[in-house]
Amino acid sequence: MDKIKVVHYINQFFAGIGGEEKADIKPFIAEELPPISSQLAKALGEDFEVVRTVVCGDSYFGENMESAQKEVLGMIKEANPDF
């Protein structure tokens, strides 16, 4: 049975980049799974695989909601996740 593919979306804080001083970071795909995404993968179990983590700063998303939403959803859809 194939694993269920998961994309994890997190903010700059949970990506380990910083707090409010880094909240203006534009959306990007993490090159390696941040620790919190690895923890999610472990918690989900063997039937799931976290295939991508998308990161975006809270302030950036809030101030650019329409364009940020399109960027983030595009990054998620590229990975063709099941969940």
Give residue ranges: language-model regions.
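Metallocofactor- and cofactor-centric catalytic cores in central/energy metabolism, strongly enriched
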Residues: 2-83
